[in-house]
């Protein structure tokens, strides 16, 4: 990746939005363009096992350096779905960064960058939510 190359950063909405924003503000020496994917697989504190695609990227990622930005990897179901479909577009390079990885599951998705790893707690804040609540907390906490 050279100084003239561009990273195509793809944010998985809604949970990743705060992490994505902070990350993008700190990538200063490279050109970056943004795309957004809006998917959901949770209801309350449980995975439904079904992926609901609400919106998909609207720009080509063919032959581009793609950085997929995720908030938390738990079961990996949502991430597996997204990765499988994005790789069909044949990006030049494909990397995944997740703010949080839960260590309890073998999700089967190799992550290139991880902020931190946690036990199996339901987290809220900094974009993470329960039924759309607590996303706006400026910190990450867990629910008992």
Go through each PLM region and give its residues:
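PRPP-associated nucleotide enzymes
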Residues: 1-144
């Amino acid at each position: 990746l050279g100084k003239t190359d561009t990273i195509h950063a793809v944010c998985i909405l809604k949970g990743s939005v705060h992490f994505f924003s902070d990350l993008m503000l700190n990538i200063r020496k490279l050109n970056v363009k943004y795309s957004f994917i809006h998917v959901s697989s949770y209801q309350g504190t449980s995975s439904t096992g079904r992926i609901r695609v609400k919106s998909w990227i609207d720009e080509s990622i063919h032959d581009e350096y793609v950085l997929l930005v995720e908030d938390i990897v738990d079961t990996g179901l949502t991430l597996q779905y997204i990765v499988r479909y994005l790789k069909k577009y044949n990006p030049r390079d494909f990397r995944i960064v997740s703010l949080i990885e839960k260590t309890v599951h073998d999700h089967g998705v190799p992550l290139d960058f991880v902020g931190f790893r946690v036990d199996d707690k339901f987290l809220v804040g900094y974009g993470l939510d329960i039924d759309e609540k607590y996303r706006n907390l400026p910190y990450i906490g867990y629910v008992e």
